């Protein structure tokens, strides 16, 4: 097993972890309904890029 030779300081530990944070997923607004949804995903009403692609219960 690998064992560290010297203790890593809190500063170095933080620098090592600096890129591990989570980012907020980008949201898109559907132009026809005005609803927000994840990019490249169908909106809750079944619209994708201005077109109705899925029939929903309300249809």
Swiss-Prot record:
| Keyword annotations from UniProtKB, A to Z | Ribonucleoprotein, Ribosomal protein
Q: Where is this region: Disordered?
A: 1-59
State the source organism's domain of life.
Bacteria
Under InterPro entries, the record lists: Ribosomal_bL32, Ribosomal_bL32_bact, Ribosomal_zn-bd
List the biased-composition ranges (Basic residues). Answer: 9-19, 49-59
Q: Which GO terms describe its cellular component?
A: large ribosomal subunit
Molecular function GO labels: structural constituent of ribosome
Choose any GO biological process term that the UniProt entry carries and state it.
Answer: translation
Q: Name one Pfam family in it.
A: Ribosomal_L32p
Q: Which family does it belong to?
A: Belongs to the bacterial ribosomal protein bL32 family.
The protein's name in its UniProt record: Large ribosomal subunit protein bL32
């Amino acid at each position: 097993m690998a064992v560290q030779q010297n203790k890593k300081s809190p500063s170095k530990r933080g620098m090592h972890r600096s890129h591990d944070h989570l980012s907020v997923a980008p949201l898109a607004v559907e132009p026809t309904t005005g609803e927000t949804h994840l990019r490249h995903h169908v909106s809750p009403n079944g619209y994708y890029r201005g077109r109705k692609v899925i029939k929903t219960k309300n249809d």
